Amino acid sequence: MGNSLASLATPCFADAAAGGGRGRGHHAAGDDAVAFDDDDAAGGCNSIGHILSFDGRDAPAFAIHGVLLPSNPSTMASTGGGGGGGASVLNDGALSIGSSSFDSSNSFSFRTLQPRQYSGPLEYCTTSPSTSGASSSRQLGPRTDKQILNDIYANRQRRRCQGSKGPPLLGRLRKAVASLLRAGPCGFPEQEEPAAMINGVGVVRNGEESISRNVDAAAADDGAERVQWARGKAGEDRVHVVVSEEHGWMFVGIYDGFNGPDATDYLADNLYAAVCRELNGVLSEDEPDPPEAAAAAGRCNGCGGAARHREVLDAMARALRRTEEGYFAEAEARAAECPELAMMGSCVLVVLMKGADVYAMNVGDSRAVLAHQAEPDLSHVVLPRGSHHDGDGDLAGVKEAIKRQFDECEMGELAALQLTMDHSTNVYKEVRRIRSEHLDDPGCITNGRVKGCLKVTRAFGAGYLKEPRWNKALLEVFQVDYVGSSPYISCRPYIRHHRLGAQDKFLILSSDGLYDYFTKEEVVAQVEAFTAGYPDEDPAKYLSHQILLRAANQAGMGFHELLEIQQGDRRQYHDDVSIIIISLEGKIWRSSQ
């Protein structure tokens, strides 16, 4: 991969009270030791972002880390009132985030990221248990590639040992051998549950009923103790997280806006409630199947479970469509005073988790990436044929070959599985679709952008690229040459279900700013390497540091030179970035080890 493990060098995560002011002058990033302070007092003059964390002691199924790193200015909503709050009148929710960087219930916390500068070599900070059981911090010098690799190897070795202590390995061996017995002479296992592609929607048929019928209760009162929530912003990005500790499900929405904040604010205020309403409608249409019917459906290649997952995914897509309809209705009512609402839009990434079931939905180029242990390649494990072979001996040899394949996978690097689909002009399929829908407009894609304006090919809002009337409502200087009446972009989402397994380690949700500097494989490798060396530290915070370092290096300036650039002007060097990392390892699967 293109990333260097040496870039894992990360500064000590010191407490704000530890002191340490900013040094004078400018220094190259490689010459400084740079750290982030976690200052509970938000709004420092040199604040560069915020950290989000979840302390759900009653919901130990996952750990959540997040970071919001703005580059665009905190723009007042176009329809904001005169009270100075900056909240859009399009947002009728009880909690508007237009005038605040964050808000949350008591199980979530936000801290301000403040840069610190040291002189001397870069140091690292971690914690290790002392003999008395208390935690003590230790300072380490700069780590070499060998030390980093040793940490990763030791972490993988621990995972391998944990997986070998109980029946899971035997079960995996039995399943693998059974698949080989069903295979043809060449040893290729049969495709048991093919993915279904229905109207461009990918549904993985490998799960069962997941969402509780009581999901609507979580939407009834965001302030109730059984529901914990957090909402924040980074420039034009918005993040919304809801965790139901009573029902054990979680909603994460990341909205990457453009041309103004109104569309993202509207999404943050309305999409979650719309999803809850649609799920309630789907799940209350009929009573749940009795156990014997559910078991029969499971024997039928999981058809019953796949049908229910499809219903949930369709409900999420309907919620997005109806939320956009509501946004356009409000925008039309205010078109005379705020015609620029027709230009505002947002990418949408939503992930809904219930137990081991993950439902992902997106339009635009935000991504959900799952880090998982690669499955072993059993295509070369061939069962012997013929009666002259020793059955027991041959079977033992097959089991040993399969075990070697599992061992190799468990000691290998984590793979990156993208649960979403990119909708941008970088994707040939999307460009071809738009051109085929606009054969009479050779300028539908200009300079790598839709009508020369947007890189994304699907988005929430942005009515001026969906209907001629919205385009005509704009001032002439902002209008595009709209040919015909067909939309240039759509809000048709990609939706997918995935059932988590013991091989899944963590989930990374982010706006596209993260992938300006990393591939998805590099992001997974960076988080794996960091958590191997610093298991108690915040990987999202570490990624934000790496983004800024790479942005500074790419611009040929020092780290602190970049941070001294005012928010807004910094957009020339990096995009707004919102990252949520959900740790799965050792949480959901604790009971099976």
UniProtKB/Swiss-Prot annotation:
Gene3D superfamilies in the cross-refs: PPM-type phosphatase domain
Keywords from the named record: Hydrolase, Magnesium, Manganese, Metal-binding, Protein phosphatase
Pfam family, one: PP2C
EC number: 3.1.3.16
Cofactor binding description: Binds 2 magnesium or manganese ions per subunit.
Sequence ranges of Low complexity compositional bias: 126-137
Single annotated GO MF: metal ion binding
Annotated binding of Mn(2+) 1, by residue: 256-257
GO terms under biological process: signal transduction
Binding site for Mn(2+) 2: 256, 512, 575
Cofactor(s) it depends on: Mg(2+); Mn(2+)
Residue ranges of the TM segments: none
Domain called PPM-type phosphatase: residue spans: 221-584
Chain spans, region Disordered: 123-142
Catalytic activity: O-phospho-L-seryl-[protein] + H2O = L-seryl-[protein] + phosphate; O-phospho-L-threonyl-[protein] + H2O = L-threonyl-[protein] + phosphate
The keyword Magnesium appears for this protein: yes
Family membership noted in the UniProt record: Belongs to the PP2C family.
Name recorded for this polypeptide: Putative protein phosphatase 2C 46
Organism, scientific name: Oryza sativa subsp. japonica
